[in-house]
């Protein structure tokens, strides 16, 4: 055994052993408890970042710990390989996205392997390979035939730079999340998943997810957005509009119906188009509205604008004529693209009415009173008692809801209705590097799904896109085909699927990744699913996690899986953050400098007071800690850390820096501290092993000092078992091991019994660290005399008897101040403890001349004497 800790050698040997033994390849073992641990698979961007290291280390620690509990553990890995970055890189480097992607996968796989992850690489999936997306296309055709997928024209967010449609969530402040381009609204034919058909179940089954963070469940509840309200119809006729009909609106506040003073419609609404026919000003305004974002968040914050149409509708209960306005804050895809405006009790309507001098009529008595003067107050939106509402005066919200419904039903102008904020999922993307949509367009037969025996529709991999829309639409060799129904010439669909589709079912494919008879092999899926522990960032709370839950229910209804939910437990790991440093240039731009290129000056208390660039010695500004990102140049290359310190040091630091659900702040000194700790473990083990391994520990003959050491060993086991097994608090488990190391380093090694006790301590340290620092643990376990590898060892078992103390040291306080301590038998009664405290020499000095009023005994901890 080397005298010095040599991580490179140790880690290479451990990884070679695991590879040769196929240590992490698993198969179904009926009767053995399974555990499926999965971290969200990476996009093959080119190289790992510290966020990856943290994510995959957390999953690996959990996987290895569960294996030590005797479970059959599956931890797979794969690649979320389709997407725009590959196309962008391809254009920049004039290389096909496939080549760029596969090269990145090869490099990143070698990086992941160097971390020593307990991954079953035999189950690796790559979503851009036909053997994967074939089954996605197969499911698409099944769902299309059932009507769960359908095609319709939709108003979409069009990114003019990326030449593709973006989901609402991909539009940030009116701009594309990737390109930064101003988004336009367009009407184009698209394919949609009917996720709204599952809205109720997606909402209700959140209650089953007891292992999910409440924050994530709340975000999903809000996104699904179930609301009970009323559909109200405002009649119009030939005199007022030129045709007869009703304007439908949905409102969650029917109690305020008598306060409606105008109605507002979306730019795409039929009445807007009707009014704009001979109105150039309105035509221009509608065009402006259509150029804006269709994301609700953007609509909520933008300036409210509108134009009157000159059209009028009737109030359904009073017959009063209400003007129709086109307003930019009304969305066509929410409700019916129209709102009844009640300025007195809705903030948007209030703002709009005051801007355009429209009437404001208060109809609810709120905590602010009976009138609602500007500026807006939150109280105006409260529920309350109805006023100025005729026959409905005096009713509360619930009473008004029911009474309004009765009145509207009588006139056949309304009824209660449940509505969801959730929209159907548009998955068509006008880009190349994605899964082809398996539909053939035939003039005679319409949209025809590609037959199963013609799947997969293979994406040509030798294409270099140029950024002008999808190259597939310019490739007759791809889109020209014959109709499977009638045999006539037809055209293949050239749109590809949203890449969120691939990541919505990959976890299920891992159960049987090589199965050629279907999307999953049912027996394997039932054996492994649902995933026991899923790990990933909270930024995926809505999109990915909601889509995966939806897909699981689709697969269940197709008979592919048996469970209702894909992930039993969810851990949302925090970000890795680091200091930022910058200079503001003369033109106002920021230049960011990597922490490795900056030298810090500290005061006497080690607080950073200034920073300078090493290259030129000139000052730089300290920008505070932010998420590691290319944009702030504050990332640390994991590979350089692994090369310098070893994977175990990186893993240890990442798990010690903070609890997994909190942000972890990168610290060079913290990494060095983790490395020093592993060197201490190695040094103690090396010294112990060099003397020869001791015989068996005789627990019955331990002296008092040895009992204290053994108590520390089992206290560490108890605390670490709780922290790792129940709370995923790896940082406190590591702290417990460090405390134990302090005890072991000071322990006597004079006798065989002393050395046997240190042996138990070192074995415990090795086992407790095994999930976190597996390489050094692999080596130490072998050197400590074990023939079987540490990956096959069990988690250490707590000996409760070792925690029993014969005597306790109790603190004595007089009037809350420390005045002494006493050693008492652990079984001492309260009376015996109090008597000993009163008799303590130092205590007698401090209560001299005082009357003892009360004695408080906290068992096993302290005695407080209250005297005056």
UniProtKB/Swiss-Prot annotation:
Enzyme class at the top of the EC tree: ligase
Motif ('HIGH' region): 42-52
An example Gene Ontology molecular-function term: leucine-tRNA ligase activity
PROSITE patterns membership: AA_TRNA_LIGASE_I (PS00178)
Record bears the keyword RNA-binding: no
GO (cellular component) term, any one: cytosol
CDD domains (alphabetical): Anticodon_Ia_Leu_BEm, LeuRS_core
Compartments, as annotated in UniProt: Cytoplasm
UniProt xrefs under Pfam families: Anticodon_1, tRNA-synt_1, tRNA-synt_1_2, tRNA-synt_1g
InterPro entries the record matches: aa-tRNA-synth_I_CS (IPR001412), aa-tRNA-synth_Ia (IPR002300), Leu-tRNA-ligase (IPR002302), Leu_tRNA-synth_edit (IPR025709), M/V/L/I-tRNA-synth_anticd-bd (IPR013155), Methionyl/Leucyl_tRNA_Synth (IPR015413), Rossmann-like_a/b/a_fold (IPR014729), tRNAsynth_Ia_anticodon-bd (IPR009080)
Keywords: Aminoacyl-tRNA synthetase, ATP-binding, Cytoplasm, Ligase, Nucleotide-binding, Protein biosynthesis
Substrates-to-products reaction catalysed: tRNA(Leu) + L-leucine + ATP = L-leucyl-tRNA(Leu) + AMP + diphosphate
Motif segment ('KMSKS' region): 627-631
Source taxon at top rank: Bacteria
Chief location bin: cytoplasm
Enzyme Commission number(s) from the entry: 6.1.1.4
Binding site for ATP: 630
GO BP annotation list: leucyl-tRNA aminoacylation
The keyword Lyase is assigned to this record: no
NCBIfam families xref list: leuS_bact
PANTHER family recorded: LEUCINE--TRNA LIGASE, MITOCHONDRIAL, LEUCYL-TRNA SYNTHETASE
Assigned protein family: Belongs to the class-I aminoacyl-tRNA synthetase family.
Protein name: Leucine--tRNA ligase
Organism the protein comes from: Pseudomonas fluorescens (strain Pf0-1)
Gene from which the chain derives: leuS
């Amino acid at each position: 055994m080397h005298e010095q800790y040599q991580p490179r050698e140790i880690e290479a040997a451990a990884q070679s052993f695991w590879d040769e033994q196929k240590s992490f390849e698993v198969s179904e073992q009926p009767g053995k408890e399974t555990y499926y641990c999965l971290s969200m698979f990476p996009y093959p961007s080119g190289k790992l970042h510290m966020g990856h290291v943290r994510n995959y280390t957390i999953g690996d620690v959990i996987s290895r710990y569960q294996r030590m509990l005797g479970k059959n553990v599956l931890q797979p890995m794969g690649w979320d390989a389709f997407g725009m970055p590959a196309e962008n890189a391809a254009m920049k480097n004039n290389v096909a996205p496939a080549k760029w992607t596969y090269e990145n996968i090869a490099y990143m796989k070698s990086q992941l392997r160097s971390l020593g992850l307990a991954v079953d690489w035999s189950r690796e999936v790559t979503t851009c390979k036909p053997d994967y997306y074939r089954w996605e296309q197969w499911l698409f055709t099944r769902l299309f035939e059932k009507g769960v997928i359908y095609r319709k024209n939709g108003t979409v967010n069009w990114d003019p730079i990326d030449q593709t449609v973006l989901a609402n969530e991909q539009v940030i402040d009116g701009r594309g999340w990737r390109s930064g381009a101003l988004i336009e609204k367009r009407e184009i034919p698209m394919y949609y998943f009917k996720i709204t058909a599952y809205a109720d179940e997606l909402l209700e089954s959140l209650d089953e997810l007891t292992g999910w963070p409440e924050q994530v469940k709340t975000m999903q509840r809000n996104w699904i957005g179930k609301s009970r309200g009323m559909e109200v119809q405002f009649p119009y006729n030939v005199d007022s509009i030129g045709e007869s009909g009703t304007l439908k609106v949905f409102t969650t506040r029917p109690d305020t119906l008598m306060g409606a003073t105008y109605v507002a419609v979306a730019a795409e609404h039929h009445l807007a188009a009707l009014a704009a026919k001979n109105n150039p000003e309105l035509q221009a305004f509608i065009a402006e509205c259509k150029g804006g974002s269709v994301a609700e968040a953007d609509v909520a914050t933008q300036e409210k604008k509108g134009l009157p149409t000159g059209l009028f509708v009737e109030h359904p209960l009073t017959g009063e004529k209400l003007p129709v306005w086109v307003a930019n804050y009304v969305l066509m895809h929410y409700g019916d693209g129209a709102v009844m405006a009640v300025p007195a009790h809705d903030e948007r309507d209030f703002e709009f009415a005051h801007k355009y001098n429209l009437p404001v009529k208060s109809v609810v008595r709120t905590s602010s009173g009976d009138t609602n003067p500007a500026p807006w107050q939150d109280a105006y939106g409260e529920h309350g008692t109805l006023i100025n509402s005729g026959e409905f005066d005096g009713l509360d919200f619930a009473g008004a809801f029911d009474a309004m419904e009765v009145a509207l039903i009588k006139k056949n102008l309304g009824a209660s209705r449940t509505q969801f904020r959730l929209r159907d999922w548009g998955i068509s993307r006008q880009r190349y590097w994605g899964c082809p949509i398996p539909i053939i367009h035939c003039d005679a037969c319409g949209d025809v799904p590609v037959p199963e025996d013609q799947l997969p529709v293979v994406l040509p991999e030798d294409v270099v896109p140029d950024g002008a829309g999808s190259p597939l639409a310019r490739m007759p060799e791809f889109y020209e085909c014959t109709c499977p129904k009638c045999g006539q010439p037809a055209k293949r669909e050239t749109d590809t699927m949203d890449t969120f589709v691939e990541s919505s079912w990959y976890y299920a494919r891992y159960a049987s990744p090589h199965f050629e008879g279907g999307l999953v092999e049912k027996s394997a899926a039932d054996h492994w699913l649902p995933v026991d522990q899923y790990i990933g960032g909270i930024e995926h709370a809505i999109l990915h996690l909601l889509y995966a839950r939806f897909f699981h229910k689709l697969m269940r209804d197709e008979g592919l899986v048996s469970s209702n939910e894909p992930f039993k437990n969810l851990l949302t790991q925090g970000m890795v953050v680091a200091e930022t440093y910058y200079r503001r240039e003369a033109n106002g731009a920021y230049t960011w400098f990597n922490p490795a290129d900056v030298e810090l000056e500290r005061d006497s208390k080690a607080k950073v007071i200034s920073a300078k660039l090493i290259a030129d010695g000139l000052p730089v500004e300290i920008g505070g800690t932010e998420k590691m990102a290319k944009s702030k140049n504050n990332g640390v290359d994991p590979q350089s850390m692994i090369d310098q310190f070893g994977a175990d040091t990186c893993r240890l630091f990442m798990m010690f820096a903070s609890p997994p659900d909190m942000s972890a702040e990168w610290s060079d000194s913290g990494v060095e501290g983790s490395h020093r700790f592993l060197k201490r473990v190695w040094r103690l083990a090396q010294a112990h092993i060099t003397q020869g391994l001791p015989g068996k520990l005789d627990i019955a003959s331990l002296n008092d000092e040895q009992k204290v050491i053994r108590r520390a060993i089992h206290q560490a086991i108890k605390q670490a078992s709780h922290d790792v097994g129940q709370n995923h608090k790896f940082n406190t488990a590591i702290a417990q091991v460090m405390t134990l190391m302090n005890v072991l380093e000071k322990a006597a090694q004079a006798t065989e019994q002393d050395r046997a006790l240190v042996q138990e301590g070192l074995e415990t340290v090795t086992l407790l660290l095994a999930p976190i620092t597996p390489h050094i643990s692999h080596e130490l376990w072998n050197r400590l005399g074990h023939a079987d590898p540490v990956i096959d060892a069990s988690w250490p078992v707590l000996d409760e008897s070792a925690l029993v103390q014969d005597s306790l040291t109790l603190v004595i306080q007089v009037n809350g101040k420390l005045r002494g301590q006493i050693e008492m038998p652990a079984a001492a009664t309260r009376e015996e403890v109090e008597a000993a405290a009163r008799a303590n020499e130092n205590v007698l000095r401090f209560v001299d001349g005082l009357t003892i009023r009360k004695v408080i005994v906290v068992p096993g901890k302290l005695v407080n004497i209250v005297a005056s």
